[in-house]
Amino acid sequence: MEPSTTSRRNFIKQCVIGGVAVYSAPLLWEMSRANAAMVSPELAAQWQTQVNGQFKPKFRNDGIAKVTGQKVYGRDYRAMDMQGWPKQQGYAFILRTTDAAHIYQGFSLDHLPASAKPYKVITAADLVRDNITLPEFYGDNMLLSEGKTADYLGQAVAILLFDNFPAFKQAKSLLQFDANLLQFGEKTAFVSESKDPYATWRLIRVEGENGAREDIYSPLHDGLFFPSVKDRKPEWLSNPNAQGSVSERGIFYAGEIDKQITDAKANQQWQVLEREYRTQIIEPMMMEPEAFNGWFDAASQTFHTVVTSQSPQDFQEMAVHMLSSGPLAGKVKHLVVHSPYIGGGFGAKDHSIFPYYGVLTAMYAKGPIRLANDRFEQFQSGLKRHPFIMKSRLAVDKSTLKIQALTSQMTIDGGGRVNFTPSVASVGATAMQSIYYTPRNDITATAYASRNPDAGSVRGYGTLQSMTAMECMIHEIADELKVDPFKLRAANVMESGQRNTQGAIPNGTLRYREMLDMAEQDSVWQNRVASKKDYETKHPGMRYGVGFAIATKDYGTGAAAPSAVIRLSKEGKIALDIGFIEMGTGTQTSQAVLVSDALGNFADEVRLAEVDIWKAMQLVQTDNPYIISQQRQDEMAANPRWTPVKAMASSASMSAYYQSHVTRIAAELIYRHGLWPAAVSIWNELYFNTPMGSTNLHNSRDGRWVDGKLTALGFPPLSIDIIAKRAHDMGLVVGVMGHAFNRWAWAEADFDILGTKERLALDALALQYGEASPTFATTFNPKDRQASMTSNGYHLIDRQAISYPKAELNNAMVTYYAPCATLVEVAINEGNGEVTLLSAHTWLEAGKVIVKELVEGQIQGGLAMGIGHALHEGLPPFENGAGNGTWNLNRYQVSLARHVGVWKQRHTILPQLSDTDPTRGIAEVVMIPVVAALIEAVYQATQVRFYELPMTAKKIKEAMA
């Protein structure tokens, strides 16, 4: 075969990392489009329609490709599908240990028949010999060495390489469940017991006078502080001092809060509820398990990869790190990263360690090699949702019903590798208060290593666990106080301008009270007593209950860095490129729709998972954005190419707000500096006596898009193809690339665009201009604008007067929230404990909705996932859990159609306050309140409270007995 070559015809752009030219390859997207091209253009175009003069999506823009089988996921590609690759596909299989208590002593493959022998076995000895290490983020011990005890259950021991499928399949069938394959020696202590905590956070706050003024003490006001570690546990200072350091003051006020709770409980002034809540280990159950395909082409010194990752940007840099040593050290000049559709993620494909095992296999393979988890392997090795143990106290003034204090000690099981556990612990702690205002709080979250499989950024990100506990406490303390839970909520609901547990003011209007009022008036709630009596009379052996819960989930990371580029062709076709991955949330569709606000038409093409195209902005990142000092930030910001963060990973709640921000700005700039002046030029030329008067078309805000055509002040509507041609002929802006940064506020800078200075919420901007015709270029030299596009085909604009959010905003931890509430009614079978969902109603505040149907889909999917978390899903810890390699859907119960009340679901999406409302990240919050609502509904039906999830039918039956 001919060796493949790397050129601009095959790859978009390149960047150089550690001497390796890295390419983000569009090949698989091109293949998907080629497949989709088999569908007639007329059929493909049916995803959009017009309603009252405005374009509306009928279904997702990849809908036709989906139902006709033309949408292909990364897991589906083989060597024969890849242009330039050898046709022979090799396969890899990872051996994993199911013992973390004994010294590993190796294995033998002598019993394998010759037809099932691997041609290469990669072990820890190879890694040591070749000096191969994992990227720092993932820790060490990529493969378990002989003579050591495993760090965790399911840890990789060896990788077997096969050059054909029959050999691979035969060997795997003989080895996968062979309990005697790996040999072990003497018993040892668990490795996790020798590790310090992954992270410890403490949020102490005491409000100022009446809660309206500056806090007496809080993380935002005073800063965060951390403990020392003694005997593998956090040890806090023992010298409280109200006038001392930040830590001494913090310990002083923590002591004051504890004393106030104790005293007020003793004198019966406050009702104090003390409870412990436990959540389980959850398998994310994405549609497609993780997969990798790779090949090193020695002839061209090119290392090819096909990855299914939510974070391909980080994969590029980390893969280069691995390739810098080992058998290919110095031999790889080009790294090609294909990022196709990943087949769902739920966070479990964000910074997963899996792709790096793929890189390792390809380093030693003699040809293309495929590493793909089956569902057993995904259960055993994939990222999990963290289990929490929360010991909490909630204190309420008996006379006013006002919450007086909240304390919690959270213990988080982070599994065998750190991954995002410190961040999950932090977010879980900040979410504890939910929608309620707490004048005093002391919330501690400590994450520990364990022998369980890794846990990571799974949907909910710690908030599902902590907010469920808070809602359960609200339910129970209302019961103790003998008050309606809505009355208790109304007395404590957080209002706009009040501070959270970190001392920060949440952004925007808080509409919690509005949602509570709507839910309280729902007929299911109003008639719950009569309905219970009626239902149980008509259905002997069944118990009826109603439950309600509300939650407000943060969205964002405090270091969001979206990018977008929009290009307008001379024919009026709109192309949008973004760095985001489509994970099933509808990003591809919503971003295509979003541009129509400014451009009057949907994007004709949306390219996802772009990485290297952003090289045109020449961005430089130097520091950790979470710990950078203000002085350092000010120093670096003077460089117009510097940014706190170059790129961000894709996650469920990030596209609607963060990605939309820069997409919207790019579209608006093309409108203001391209389409609008071009349209005015046409109107002046053809539809007005221009030499004798003025059209007064000076304000681009006068433009209106109707039926995809632009009109203004009564002038004839112009189609986008006509305007686009004129914009190109006039040398106007026809391409915009932008980058933004958000640390709970957007960075802003001035940019000079064709002589006009604009203040934009961007920190980098690059433009493309049309190739002006001499007929229209009367005030400038067309060649000058074309000559300015020297940065990968773009004119890179130097920013001025940059303003980044202050570094101390990191102490706010979160300030953007999206609320959701759920009301459920259930029936419980006394005989077997099975819960039937009779109905569910969800209220959601999503801000300005881009595509209503996508939001509705998130509501439905979130409800199903939340029901699974509450009633069905759960993995035992340790040796009986996922790490033993025997778990699959035959044992792990996910929500089925009969569990979720498919035809009994209702929802209310709150109307936006105005057209200027921001979109909100809602893809996680929609799964949270149903959990606590179900816990309360089960209590109302059975009079039994559950403090540990899941509430399986077996547990409910036993509790009722």
Regions found by a protein language model. Name each.
Residues 327, 343-366, 370-372, 380, ...:
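Thiamine diphosphate
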Residues 125, 326-333, 364-368, 425-459, ...:
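C-terminal catalytic domains of large/alpha subunits in multi-subunit enzymes
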Residues 367-412, 661-687:
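Phosphate/diphosphate-binding loops
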Residues 1-6, 10, 32-34:
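N-terminal secretory signal peptides
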Residues 10-31:
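N-terminal export signals
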Residues 32-223, 227-228:
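Flexible, low-hydrophobicity surface segments
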Residues 209-324, 493-571, 808, 822, ...:
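Helix-loop-helix junctions that connect adjacent transmembrane helices in secondary transporters/permeases
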Residues 132-136, 171-174, 316-318, 346-352, ...:
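Short acidic, glycine/serine/threonine-rich loops at helix termini
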